[in-house]
Amino acid sequence: MPQNFYTYAFFNTPDFSMDLPSGNLGKLLLINGKNISAVVEPGISLESSQNDDEQVIKMVLAHDRVICELSRQMTVLPLRFGTYFLSEDTLLNHIESHAQEYQDKLNNIKGKNEYTLKVIPQKVEELAKASGTNGRDYFLAKKQYYEQQKSFFAAQNQEKSYLINLITETYQSSAIIQEHAEEVRFHLLVDRHNKALLLEQVLSLQKKCPHWDLILGEPLPPYHFI
């Protein structure tokens, strides 16, 4: 009878004894291919939990936790939440047929972490009408406020373009940029030994872009570079 093998990550077949973390419900297993191996949890069924939001959240958190713990031991190729195979043979056949692709990806991310730099626009202060201010004075203050607002947004847009161009030029294929309504996110693939340099770069960028708040996240497995 087929048994689901919920799969967390692929990596080079280890030549040392791994310390496997606990899974979502039970123990994890190491499935070794010729050159690429996988960590799996047997018997996990997403279908039985898809209508239970609390259970799904628990599974998502377990998925991320396992990948983070594995990545502290070696370079891993993190798989998307919900990845599973119907049998060990199906998993091994998949690994063998995609071995070169996965090897290339592992070589690209070896010894590196992913950092997310959130760039959040600062807000323009609202114009408050002071008590006792007559109509003409308020009109002039309002006109001045809109001129300042215009200059503020122009500077903000200029700084945004500067950030995007500089990070794209510096990191090239090691940067993924996502623009959202309320912020811009830069996903950066950085060598583990260059964390201090990255922090210095972010501090320097913050000084050059005073109309934005720059927030650097913690190092994570390279989810966006697989």
Where are these regions (language model features)?
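An interfacial alpha-helical scaffold signature
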Residues: 1-215, 219-226
